[in-house]
UniProtKB/Swiss-Prot annotation:
Pathway annotation: Isoprenoid biosynthesis; isopentenyl diphosphate biosynthesis via DXP pathway; isopentenyl diphosphate from 1-deoxy-D-xylulose 5-phosphate: step 1/6
InterPro entries: DXP_reductoisomerase, DXP_reductoisomerase_C, DXP_reductoisomerase_N, DXPR_C, DXPR_C_sf, NAD(P)-bd_dom_sf
Record Pfam families: DXP_redisom_C, DXP_reductoisom, DXPR_C
EC number: 1.1.1.267
Family assignment from sequence similarity: Belongs to the DXR family.
Gene name in the database record: dxr
Record GO terms (molecular function): 1-deoxy-D-xylulose-5-phosphate reductoisomerase activity; manganese ion binding; NADPH binding
Names of required cofactors: Mg(2+); Mn(2+)
One BP term from GO: isopentenyl diphosphate biosynthetic process, methylerythritol 4-phosphate pathway involved in terpenoid biosynthetic process
Organism: Nitrosospira multiformis (strain ATCC 25196 / NCIMB 11849 / C 71)
Binding site for 1-deoxy-D-xylulose 5-phosphate: K128, S154, E155, S184, H207, S220, N225, K226, E229
Protein name: 1-deoxy-D-xylulose 5-phosphate reductoisomerase
Amino acid sequence: MIAVRHLTILGSTGSIGVSTLDVVARHPDRFRVVALTANKSVQKILEQCRRFEPRYAVLLDEASAELLQVEIRRAGLATEVLWGVDSLEKVASLPDVDTVMAAIVGAAGIRPTFAAAATGKRVLLANKETMVMAGRIFTDVVKENHATLLPIDSEHNAIFQSLPQHFSGDLRAVGVRRILLTASGGPFRQMPLAALENVTPGQACAHPNWVMGQKISVDSATMMNKGLEVIEAHWLFEASPEQIEVVVHPQSIIHSMVEYVDGSVLAQLGNPDMRTPIAHALGFPERIETGVNPLDMFKVARLDFEAPDFERFPCLRLAYQALASGGSAPAVLNAANEVAVDSFLKCLMPFTSIPAMIEDVMQTIGRRDIATLDDVLAADGMAREAAQEWLTCLA
C-alpha cells in the first residue's frame, strides 16, 4: 500500500508551484494537498482550490485574501482563507503535513521555510534564497530537528542524484573531487557587450531553454542565478568554493555533474523541464511518472561546453566574492539583486546597472557577522535601503 504524503505548497501559483501541482495531479493515490499559498494571485489560487480542495489557502496580501474568501464561499468550497506571514509559517508547520514545497521566490520565503524545517518536515527546497542568505543557520535547524532536505533546483537535484545515497556531508569521504555546476549562459551569451546596455525586460525574460518566472529569468540572463546556486551548493553539499566549478552548457541537457577522484564523472541528463527534479523529490527514494517527454539523444545530437565569461557576467564574480567574504555578504548580495532586478523589470534602470548597483551596495554595507535569522533579515533590510538610495541617485 502506498503511503500518502500530505503537502503544503508555498508559492503554488508560481512556475515551480504550478509544475508541482501538475505532478501531484498525476498521482492522486500518493499525494494530498493540505495548503496552498500565494502572494496575491486570487484567480490562480482559486482555480487550484477548486481542483485540489485544500484545507487552507493563504495569501500574503490581506485585500487579496478578502477577495479570495468571497470567491471561495461562492464556489461552495470548505477551504479556509488566511493571510500574512504568520499564516505562511502556520501552514508550513501543520502537524499533519509531512512535506513542504518551499517555492516562494526571494527573501519572502525564508520564514515559512525555516518553520517547515523547525518542525521536522520533508522540505523540498526551491527557495534558494534561504540557503544563500542563511545557509549555516538553516542547515543547523534542519539537523537539529531531523528534517529532510531535498533540492529542487535542477542543478542541485542533479548533483544530489549523482552523489552516493549514503553521502552525509563529506565530499572527500565519498571520493568527490569537484562539482561541475552547469549553466545555459542565458539569452545574452553571445550578444555583443556593447548591446547589453539596451536590452529590454522582454528580451531578458526570453530564456532559450527553460520556462520560468520573470525574476529568475533575469537572474539567468545576468548569471546571478548561477552565482546564487554556487552559494547554495556550498551549503547543501558542504563544498568549498574551489570544489565548485561553473560550466556553461548552452543546451541545458546535462543539469550538473560530479567528478570523482578516480576520473569518473557522473551526470544527470534530461529535457529541461522542472517536473523532473520536482517529481524526484516528491517521490524520493522512488521514481514516479512526470509527463516529461523522453530525452531524444539523436535529436540533441551535440553537447557544448564553455568557460564562463566573467566580463560579460560580473554578477557571477560578485557571488563568488560574497561567498568568500561570508557573514552577511551573501544576504546583502541577494537583497541588492532583488531590488536591482525589480527596478530593471520596471524599466527604471538599464540591464547593465544590475551588477553596478549590487557591487556598490556590497561595498557600502560591508561584511558583518551573522548569528541569528534576525541578523540575516537586518542585513537584508540595510541592503534594500542602500539599493533604493542608489536608485534614487541614478534617477
